[in-house]
């Protein structure tokens, strides 16, 4: 059966995250599967590179699915674009290697968190930024961010207290930059735990507000305790920016990280 790979972007504001929930179409995965199943007259299951939470957006999510169809990939792309709502956009669609799987083949992700750091409201971007008018010390935030990079057990930055799998992840880089009145945090790594990027962001914002010292980051990591870290930043400021794959797709074997 042909295997298809697609990249898409979406505004997550009105969706209950990526993952399907029963028969509701109010998830990105649920909406894609409903449209594809209707278009191709067969049940279609769509796999994503990971599960974005309710209210989180994506600039470049990668998904894959298998389906029997006489439609070419360009025609399937055209038909899919015509049927999806305006807040879900398919950027590319192609037939791919039989063993490619959007989640299992994924080798890394980049997330961006946007903070509107101004007393002046940003009306047209309000669904895509976290408005925080208090001044932020971005230099202190960057010092703290550097201490959070590397390969660590990130239990303190995970909202799933019952997680039985390893919480060890590799975070390659965290950058904090000011772009006018916006403070942008960028996180790149091999995978992230449940709410991990938002908890990292909330902790770094506490540093920026002077509520926590940058040098306490190693102690938070060592605590292996969610209560040691800062709050979970709101979903609306988070964007799945990029997903990364090997040029040649490896054999699918072990379960990959979110």
Per-segment meaning from a language model:
Residues 1-258:
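Structured-RNA-binding interfaces characteristic of tRNA pseudouridine synthases
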């Amino acid at each position: 059966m042909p295997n298809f790979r697609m990249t898409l972007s979406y505004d997550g504001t009105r969706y209950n995250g990526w993952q399907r929930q029963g028969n509701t179409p109010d998830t990105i995965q649920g909406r894609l599967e409903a449209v594809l199943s209707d278009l191709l007259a067969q049940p279609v299951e769509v796999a994503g590179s990971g599960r974005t939470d309710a209210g989180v957006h994506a600039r470049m999510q990668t998904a894959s699915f298998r389906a029997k169809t006489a439609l070419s990939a360009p025609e399937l792309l055209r038909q899919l674009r015509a049927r999806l709502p305006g807040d879900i956009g398919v950027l590319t669609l192609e037939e791919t290697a039989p063993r490619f799987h959007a989640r299992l083949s994924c080798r890394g992700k980049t997330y961006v968190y946007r903070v509107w750091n101004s007393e002046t409201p940003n009306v047209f971007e309000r669904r895509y930024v976290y408005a925080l008018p208090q001044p932020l010390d971005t230099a202190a935030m960057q010092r703290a961010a550097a201490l959070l990079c590397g390969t660590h057990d990130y239990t303190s930055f995970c909202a799933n207290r019952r997680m039985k799998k390893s919480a060890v992840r590799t975070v390659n880089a965290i950058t904090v930059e000011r772009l006018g009145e916006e403070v942008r945090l960028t996180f790149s790594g091999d995978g992230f735990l449940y709410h991990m990027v938002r908890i990292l962001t909330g902790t770094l914002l506490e540093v920026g507000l002077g509520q926590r010292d940058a040098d306490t980051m190693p102690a938070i990591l060592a605590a292996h305790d969610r209560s040691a870290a800062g709050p979970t930043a709101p979903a609306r400021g988070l964007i799945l920016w990029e997903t990364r794959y090997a040029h040649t797709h490896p054999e699918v074997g072990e379960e990959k990280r979110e």
